[in-house]
């Protein structure tokens, strides 16, 4: 049985054109220099419209992000604030509000971070992953385990 398994592994490597230790052609691997650092469009979960531009920066080897611009803000509210936030973020202006922090690189994703949802003021655990050659960011916010959460996709501003 073990002999058959070894033969199957060797045949798979030969057919893929890879040698042991290589990534098979077409496999997803993010280049080391490609990171989420930059500007991202965020979207409303219900309408699908762009809501803000978030800038992600590297801070002491970790990633963090803040709202840089609101898209189509309420014209009656000239300085929207995070009214549902708690702690240091309570009542702070949305523009400049830190909504991502403490993300550390783990192979092809950034994990262990936190994300603030300014709509409800809650902080969630967060993992992010680059997709589509760095043009799309998968943002997963969750409580406890990653399966208990929701995913948003942000698009890189080019």
Predicted regions and their residues:
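Positively charged n-region of N-terminal signal peptides that target proteins for export
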Residues: 1-4
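Edge beta-strand at a domain terminus
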Residues: 25, 134-136, 142-158
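Central antiparallel beta-sheet cores of small beta-barrel/beta-sandwich binding domains
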Residues: 42-126
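Structural motif
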Residues: 39, 62, 134-136
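N-terminal helix-cap/turn-to-beta initiation motif at the start of protein domains
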Residues: 25-38
């Amino acid at each position: 049985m073990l002999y058959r398994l070894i033969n199957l592994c060797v045949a798979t490597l030969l057919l893929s054109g890879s040698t042991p230790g290589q990534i098979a052609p077409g496999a997803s691997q993010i280049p080391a220099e490609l990171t989420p650092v930059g500007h991202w469009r965020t979207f409303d979960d219900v309408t699908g419209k762009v809501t803000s531009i978030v800038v992600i920066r590297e801070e002491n080897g970790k990633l963090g992000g803040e709202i840089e611009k609101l898209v189509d803000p309420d014209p009656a509210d000239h300085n929207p604030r995070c009214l549902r936030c708690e702690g240091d973020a309570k009542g702070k202006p949305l523009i400049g509000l830190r909504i991502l922090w403490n993300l550390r690189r783990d192979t092809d994703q950034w994990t262990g971070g936190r994300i603030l949802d300014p709509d409800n003021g809650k902080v969630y655990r967060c993992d992010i992953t680059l997709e589509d050659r760095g043009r799309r960011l998968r943002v997963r916010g969750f409580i406890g385990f990653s399966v208990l959460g929701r995913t948003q996709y942000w698009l890189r501003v080019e």
